[in-house]
């Protein structure tokens, strides 16, 4: 497990959501590609034994996916994961910019990684900056390359299972 990729605040915020084994999930109609988002959820279900249950109303969801034209009034932002407390408890909104970018799948994986409790490899807020060979070894880096395959890396999978399995 790459402890350098664990964000204790994110992990702590997500823990109550995953503790009952079900995550009520909403994918907004603006999101593309929906199939890829469902693949991420299905893979994670099998990996850590969590059921991502689709809900029709976003107000009932604990995890929400959106595509919007402008994120946090920052034209350079392409994605953002926002944890907050709602009437259903701890909740995450994951935003991806609507512009047709070739890295959109990568951004969905990256923001979903935050939901799962992961941080950027270069974050040193908890004194555990990544010293691996390459930050390309994780979707939590900003080192997306157009030739990259769009899926979790071994370091990501090891970190996710280390946090959430047994």
Describe the predicted segments one by one.
Residues 5-11, 58-60, 159-160:
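Short alpha-helical interface patches
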Residues 25-32, 97-99, 145-148:
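Second-shell loop/turn segments in exported
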Residues 26, 66, 141:
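Residue-level detector of conserved, well-ordered beta-strand and adjacent loop positions
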Residues 103, 123-166:
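Metalloprotease/metallohydrolase-associated module, dominated by Zn2+-dependent proteases
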């Amino acid at each position: 497990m790459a402890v350098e990729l664990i964000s204790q605040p994110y992990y702590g915020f997500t823990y109550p959501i995953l503790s009952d084994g079900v995550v009520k999930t909403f994918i907004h109609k603006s999101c593309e590609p929906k199939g890829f988002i469902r693949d991420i959820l299905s893979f994670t279900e099998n990996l850590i034994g969590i059921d991502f249950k689709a809900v029709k109303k976003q107000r009932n969801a604990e995890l929400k996916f959106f595509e919007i034209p402008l994120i946090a009034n920052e034209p350079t932002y392409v994605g953002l994961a926002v944890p907050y407390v709602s009437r259903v408890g701890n909740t995450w909104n994951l935003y991806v910019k609507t512009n047709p970018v070739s890295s959109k799948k990568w951004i969905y994986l990256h923001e979903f990684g935050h939901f799962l409790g992961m941080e950027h490899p270069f974050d040193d807020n908890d004194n555990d900056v990544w010293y691996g060979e390459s930050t390309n070894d994780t979707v939590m880096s900003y080192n997306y390359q157009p030739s990259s395959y769009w899926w979790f890396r071994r370091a990501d999978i090891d970190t996710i299972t280390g946090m959430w399995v047994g």
